[in-house]
Structures are given as structure tokens and as C-alpha cells.
From Swiss-Prot:
Cited Pfam families: Anamorsin_N (PF20922), CIAPIN1 (PF05093)
Disulfide bridges in this chain: none
Record Gene3D superfamilies: Vaccinia Virus protein VP39
A GO molecular-function annotation: metal ion binding
Positions that bind [4Fe-4S] cluster: 273, 276, 284, 287
Region (Disordered): 219-241
Keyword annotations: 2Fe-2S, 4Fe-4S, Apoptosis, Cytoplasm, Iron, Iron-sulfur, Metal-binding, Mitochondrion, Nucleus
Source taxonomy: Eukaryota, Metazoa, Chordata, Craniata, Vertebrata
Family: Belongs to the anamorsin family.
The protein's name: Anamorsin
Taxonomic source organism: Danio rerio
Function: Component of the cytosolic iron-sulfur (Fe-S) protein assembly (CIA) machinery required for the maturation of extramitochondrial Fe-S proteins. Part of an electron transfer chain functioning in an early step of cytosolic Fe-S biogenesis, facilitating the de novo assembly of a [4Fe-4S] cluster on the scaffold complex NUBP1-NUBP2. Electrons are transferred to CIAPIN1 from NADPH via the FAD- and FMN-containing protein NDOR1.
Motif placement: Cx2C motif 1: 273-276
Subcellular location field: Cytoplasm; Nucleus; Mitochondrion intermembrane space
């Protein structure tokens, strides 16, 4: 019993399966009760009734399953999850199960059993020992699963439940505020700082040679560029009509606009005096616009078909 980790006052759930001997089961339960101190702290449950018994969650400090040597118990995933549910946080599980050294249906390897225990939510899964399977237990296993191999052995594994309930949650204290960091500036070497310091007195010193910025330019840099050389190549083809780009930046759009305004101004009708549009007070005696209201310069005005020819 010492290797099971039982302690006085701890509640224990003992899971058994057929064909366990009733006398062996009773003797094993009494030995457990002697360690924990009271028979009422030990509960017995048949493996086939485990999922139907509705044990209270987190009610047992230790769960022992399949430890009777005259029986062999295959733990399903549902059974392992139920065992984890009824265990208290920090509780322990000790189970024994027949395993095979090769892949086979009905019986799994020790590695797969360990993975199944972890998937049930238990941690610290450890393989304690491996021993040969008794002939009686092997016969019962063959009858139940139909396994016919000769690589069977009995493995004992221990696991524990985390110190928190499976599915429990807690509030995390996170601070997303900007941390105040104090940066310590390195001390400057006085000699280095003095070398990089320039005062007004240094500028008046005759020993200080200043570079003339104009001396850095050559004759080509001082030439004024020809405006035609600054234009882009668009519209240079004489066979095509000049057309500025949508987002013209070379000045062709402004040039075409000025040419259009000049052509429009040249096409406007001109009078001899240039005052016809101002009204009758400024028109000549033979002006064809006599009697018509004033109009804007360049505005198209239709003359009535009168006796202009007589004038």
C-alpha cells in the first residue's frame, strides 16, 4: 500500500471489474481502509457502472482502478474523463491496464494509454512498473476483446489532477499602460564635448578656414537653363497634335491654354472705334449697333435685317 501514496483521512474510490474475486476485493478494500483510517472513506464501484453512478465532482482524493491481479480492465476515454471529474484538484490516479508491445485492435500500447490519460485532463503521467499478465487475467481479456497475441503485459501508471478544476477560469491582471522608463544619459567626456563646440569667438579667428560655397560651383552650374530644355518629351512629335497629359507638370498644359486664349481673342470681331459694346452714347453715327443695348466684349450679337445697306 505504500506505493499507492495513500494517506490518513483521504477519500478513495476503488474501481474493479469482472471476474474479480469477491474475497480478494474485500481484502483489498479493508487494507485500504486501514491506511486511510475509516471504512467510510473507501467507495467501491464496478467499472461498468462508473458512468451511471453520478458521483459528485471533485469528491475523491485518490482513484484506484484495475489493481486486482486476477482481472484486466481496459479504460475507455469516457472512463478516464469521469475519473478526472470525480478527483479533487491535486488528487492522484493509480491504474493498471494490459498493454501490448505492438499495434493491435482492442489492446493498446503503453504510449497510447499514456496519451489517453493526458487527453482526459490529467498531468504528471508516469509509468511506474510493468509485469507479466496473470493467466487468469489474460484469459478474461482474450474472451472480452478477442486478442490472440503473445505480447501482453500489465503496466501501472500514475497521474494527478491539476490544482484547479478542469474548465475553470480566472481573471488575469494585465496592464496595457505605457510603462515609465527612466533613461540615464551617459556622462559626456568634457574633452570630447569641447572639440565639438563652436563659439562665435572661433568664427572670428583668422586661423579658422571657412569654405566658400560659391567656390564649389563650376561654370556649368552658373548657366541659366534654356526653358525649352526643361520641357518633357510629350507633344514634341510634329505629326501629332499637341496634347497635354492628364496631370501635366511640364508646362505644356499652360502653354496650350494660352495659345487657345490668344486664338479666341484674335477671332473676335473688331470695330474701328472699339466702343460699340458700351452703348449708343459711345457709338458712331454710322454704327450698325445703334439702338441696341450694351453688351460684353466678344459677345455674339445678331443684327436685325433692317436698312443697313442704305446706310
Amino acid at each position: 500500500m505504500a506505493d499507492l501514496g495513500l494517506q490518513k483521512g483521504k477519500r478513495v474510490l476503488l474501481i474493479w471489474t469482472q471476474p474479480s474475486s469477491s474475497s480478494a476485493l474485500k481484502q483489498f478494500a479493508e487494507s485500504i481502509a486501514a491506511v486511510v483510517g475509516d471504512q467510510s472513506l473507501v467507495s467501491l464501484e464496478n467499472s461498468e457502472r462508473l458512468l451511471l453512478s453520478s458521483h459528485n465532482a471533485s469528491s475523491y482524493d485518490c482513484v484506484l482502478s484495475g489493481l486486482l491481479t486476477d482481472s484486466s480492465l481496459i479504460h475507455s476515454s469516457e472512463m478516464l474523463v469521469e475519473m478526472a471529474r470525480v478527483m479533487k484538484p491535486g488528487g492522484t490516479l493509480v491504474l493498471e491496464e494490459p498493454v501490448t508491445g505492438s499495434e493491435d485492435t482492442g489492446v493498446r500500447t503503453a504510449e497510447k494509454l499514456m496519451s489517453a490519460i493526458k487527453l482526459a485532463g490529467l498531468v504528471s503521467v508516469t509509468e511506474v512498473k510493468t509485469e507479466p499478465l496473470s493467466p487468469k487475467a489474460a484469459a478474461a481479456l482474450t474472451e472480452r476483446t478477442g486478442f490472440s497475441g503473445n505480447t501482453l503485459s500489465r503496466v501501472r501508471m500514475t497521474a494527478s489532477k491539476p490544482d484547479f478544476e478542469v474548465g475553470s477560469s480566472t481573471q488575469l491582471k494585465l496592464s496595457f499602460g505605457k510603462k515609465k522608463t527612466t533613461t540615464v544619459k551617459p556622462a559626456l567626456d568634457p574633452g570630447t564635448a569641447q572639440k565639438w563646440t563652436l563659439s562665435a569667438n572661433d568664427m572670428d579667428d583668422d586661423d579658422v578656414d571657412l569654405v566658400d560655397s560659391d567656390a564649389l560651383l563650376d561654370a556649368d552650374d552658373l548657366k541659366k537653363p534654356d526653358p525649352s530644355s526643361l520641357k518633357a518629351s510629350c507633344g514634341d512629335d510634329s505629326k501629332k497634335k499637341k496634347k497635354a497629359c492628364k496631370n501635366c507638370t511640364c508646362g505644356l498644359a499652360e502653354e496650350l491654354e494660352q495659345e487657345s486664349k490668344a486664338a479666341q481673342k484674335a477671332s473676335q470681331p473688331k470695330s474701328a472705334c472699339g466702343n460699340c459694346y458700351l452703348g449708343d452714347a459711345f457709338r458712331c453715327g454710322s454704327c450698325p449697333y445703334l439702338g441696341m443695348p450694351a453688351f460684353k466684349p466678344g459677345e455674339k450679337v445678331l443684327l436685325a435685317n433692317t436698312d443697313i445697306a442704305d446706310k
